[in-house]
Regions:
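Thiamine diphosphate
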Residues: 1-170
Length: 170
C-alpha cells in the first residue's frame, strides 16, 4: 500500500471529514486522493493560515479536519496557531510534506524546511517526522488522536524518503 493510501486510511479511521489544502507537486497526489474520496469535504485555501480558521470553524461545527500542505507553507500558519488554535484549545492536524532537506534544489525552501521540526518546537507545536513508508497509517492515526484528544496542534512531517522529492526542472 502506498503512503498516500495509508494516509487516506489513517484520516478516515480518525473521522477526519474536512481537508483544507494548498497544492504543491509533492502533496498533490494525497490531495487528489482526498478530493476523489466521498468521505472528505475538501477546501482549497489561498494561504495556509486561512486553513487554521477553516479547520477551527469545522471543529466548532462538530467536524474534524486536517491541513495538507508543504513545509514552507506551514510556516505561514505559526501566528494563527499561536493566537487562535493554542489559546482557544482548537485542535489542528497538519499532514505536511517536507522541503529543504534531502533532495532539495531550491535554496528558498531550505531556511524553514530544513529547520521545520525545531521551528515547530519553538512555537510549542508538537510534531513527528515520518521517515519510512511502513507505518504511515499508524502515524496519521496517532497524530490525529493526539491533536483531537488534547485539543492542540499536531503536525506530521512527511519526509522525502516517504514522498519522493521535487526535482529541479532542466
Amino acid at each position: 500500500m502506498t503512503w498516500i493510501d495509508q494516509a487516506i486510511n489513517g484520516l478516515k479511521r480518525t473521522d477526519i471529514e474536512m481537508i483544507a489544502y494548498l497544492p504543491d507537486t509533492t502533496i498533490s497526489p494525497l490531495v487528489e486522493a482526498a478530493k476523489d474520496d466521498d468521505a472528505f469535504e475538501t477546501v482549497l485555501v489561498t494561504r495556509e493560515e486561512a486553513a487554521v480558521g477553516v479547520l477551527s470553524g469545522a471543529w466548532l461545527g462538530g467536524k474534524r479536519g486536517a491541513l495538507l500542505c508543504q513545509s514552507s507553507g506551514l510556516a505561514n500558519t505559526f501566528n494563527a496557531l499561536s493566537s487562535l488554535s493554542m489559546p482557544a484549545r482548537l485542535p489542528f492536524l497538519g499532514i505536511v510534506t517536507r522541503r529543504g532537506d534531502l533532495g532539495e534544489f531550491n535554496l528558498a525552501q531550505v531556511t524553514s524546511g530544513y529547520n521545520m521540526p525545531e521551528l515547530l518546537d519553538d512555537v510549542n507545536v508538537r510534531n513527528h517526522s515520518v521517515h519510512d513508508e511502513d507505518n504511515v497509517e499508524e502515524r496519521v492515526r496517532m497524530a490525529a488522536t493526539t491533536a483531537f484528544s488534547t485539543e492542540t496542534p499536531y503536525v506530521l512531517l512527511m519526509e522525502t524518503t516517504v514522498t519522493g522529492y521535487k526535482e529541479e526542472s532542466k
